[in-house]
């Protein structure tokens, strides 16, 4: 039988970039808090976590690409909140952000984690930012830690 590879949840020594959309900041700030908490609890130092704020979710892939291209990071976490309104704008933004982050994840050589909430209501977003449904920022950070370590294992 061949090898089994797993990424471990140890953030010590990992350099992580976080891109956060400012639109719906009352939600995204909670996602950021969750991500920072997860990174700290798994051993990351404050000095190893950089945060870039962008105007909204649509701008997230651009900043994530710049961070990835810098070569300084083991993983990038993207955080944002898009809440459905009465126009098709929601669909356009969600599709482009998801495609942009997915493309970066496949092309940059480092994990780029999608932590952007796409919800029908404000209540759903609040639930996913630290109340009933956990904190998706925390979950995105845990995925980033695991994938950064898995990437290192697979590169040996």
Swiss-Prot record:
EC main class here is transferase
Q: Which Gene3D superfamilies match?
A: Lumazine/riboflavin synthase
Highest rank taxon of the organism: Bacteria
Q: Which GO terms describe its biological process?
A: riboflavin biosynthetic process
EC nos:
2.5.1.78
Q: Report the catalytic activity.
A: (2S)-2-hydroxy-3-oxobutyl phosphate + 5-amino-6-(D-ribitylamino)uracil = 6,7-dimethyl-8-(1-D-ribityl)lumazine + phosphate + 2 H2O + H(+)
Biochemical pathway: Cofactor biosynthesis; riboflavin biosynthesis; riboflavin from 2-hydroxy-3-oxobutyl phosphate and 5-amino-6-(D-ribitylamino)uracil: step 1/2
One of the record's GO molecular function terms: 6,7-dimethyl-8-ribityllumazine synthase activity
Glycoprotein: present as a keyword of the record?
no
* Oligomer and partners: Forms an icosahedral capsid composed of 60 subunits, arranged as a dodecamer of pentamers.
Q: What does this protein do?
A: Catalyzes the formation of 6,7-dimethyl-8-ribityllumazine by condensation of 5-amino-6-(D-ribitylamino)uracil with 3,4-dihydroxy-2-butanone 4-phosphate. This is the penultimate step in the biosynthesis of riboflavin.
Q: What is this protein called?
A: 6,7-dimethyl-8-ribityllumazine synthase
């Amino acid at each position: 039988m061949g090898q089994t590879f797993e990424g471990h949840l140890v953030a010590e020594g990992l350099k992580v970039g976080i891109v956060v959309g400012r639109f719906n900041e009352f939600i995204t700030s909670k996602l950021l808090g969750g991500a920072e908490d997860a990174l700290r609890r798994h051993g990351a130092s404050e000095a190893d976590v950089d945060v870039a704020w962008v105007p909204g979710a649509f701008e997230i892939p651009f900043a994530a690409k710049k961070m990835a291209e810098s070569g300084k990071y083991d993983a990038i976490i993207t955080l944002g909140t898009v809440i459905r309104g009465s126009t098709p704008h929601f669909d356009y933004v969600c599709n482009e952000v998801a495609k942009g982050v997915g493309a970066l994840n496949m092309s940059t050589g480092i994990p780029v984690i999608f932590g952007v909430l796409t919800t029908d209501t404000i209540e759903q977003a609040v639930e996913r930012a630290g109340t009933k449904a956990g904190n998706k920022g925390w979950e995105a950070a845990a995925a980033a830690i695991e994938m950064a370590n898995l990437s290192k294992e697979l590169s040996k």
